[in-house]
């Protein structure tokens, strides 16, 4: 070795190894969080894709699709010449022509293996039809948009979105100030509710002990036994759903990170957007 050349000392090598170890540990610690953020970005993209398909379906057919159920093979259950058999259920992927990760019941799954929930309004303006305005052929056009009394709209979805719920008040928003969309208290907003709602119950969906606002989104009235479905597992699993017929028409959407680990993703479309798209397509006057 040339006496003029110097190498790293053991202390210098040890310091470098320590720094590398710290950086690797930091990276490894961040990976689960980065993976979770990616999953939520994937959820947002997929839900936006589903909503676009639902609005496109309405532009073509003049109505909203009914939800699918576990044994309907990804096809809407009812709708068209008759109203939906169930107004709460799952994304009708085959009716909408969507692709994605499905389980054995042909239900579209979020990144955590839970089917996206899809709820469509069963509201019926008193036009003599006696069927849901948003899901039966010709009903939306027959009912029309304009009314002379508040909320100045005859086509009126009943879903209310808020950022704080109250199970003790029959599944409604805690107060007018927390309403994000809708007019359950009659104190604001031109519409009484959204025509449809799409939900992912998030990473903690399999926690049967869900409470508070997450329980509002899952369903205060248990319409089925809660058997967490296994992705690509046996068909016929039971799922928990809100019961619209029991008045469960409120959904909660707020940021994650609260003490109760709220992580649901809730999306809907304003009637302004839905109706304008349908007018453009000639489906509404």
Predicted regions and their residues:
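N-terminal pilin/flagellin-like segments and related low-complexity appendage regions
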Residues: 33-285
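N-terminal single-pass transmembrane signal-anchor helix
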Residues: 4-35
């Amino acid at each position: 070795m040339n006496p003029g050349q110097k190498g790293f000392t053991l202390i210098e090598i040890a310091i470098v190894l320590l720094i590398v170890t710290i950086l690797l540990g930091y990276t490894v610690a961040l990976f689960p969080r980065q993976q979770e953020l990616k999953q939520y970005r994937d959820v947002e993209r997929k839900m936006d894709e589903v909503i676009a398909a639902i609005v496109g379906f309405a532009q073509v057919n003049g109505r909203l699709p009914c939800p699918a159920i576990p044994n309907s093979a990804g096809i809407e259950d009812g709708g068209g010449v008759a109203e939906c058999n169930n107004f709460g259920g799952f994304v009708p992927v085959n009716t909408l022509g969507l692709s994605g990760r499905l389980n054995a019941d042909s239900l579209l799954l979020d990144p955590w293996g839970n089917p996206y929930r899809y709820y469509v309004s069963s509201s019926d303006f008193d036009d003599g039809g006696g069927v849901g305005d948003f899901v039966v052929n010709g009903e939306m056009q027959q009912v029309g948009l304009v009314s002379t009394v508040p909320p100045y709209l005859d086509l009126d979805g009943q879903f209310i979105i808020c950022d704080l719920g109250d199970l003790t008040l029959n599944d409604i928003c805690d107060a007018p100030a927390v309403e994000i969309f809708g007019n359950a208290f009659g104190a604001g907003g031109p519409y009484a509710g959204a025509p449809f709602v799409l939900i992912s119950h998030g990473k903690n969906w399999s926690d049967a002990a869900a409470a508070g606002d997450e329980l509002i989104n899952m369903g205060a009235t248990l319409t089925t036994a809660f058997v967490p479905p296994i992705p690509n597992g046996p068909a016929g699993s039971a799922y928990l759903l809100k019961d619209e017929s029991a008045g469960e028409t409120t959904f909660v959407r707020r940021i994650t990170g609260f003490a109760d680990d709220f992580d649901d993703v809730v999306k809907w479309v304003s009637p302004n957007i839905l109706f304008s798209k349908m007018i453009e397509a000639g489906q509404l006057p």
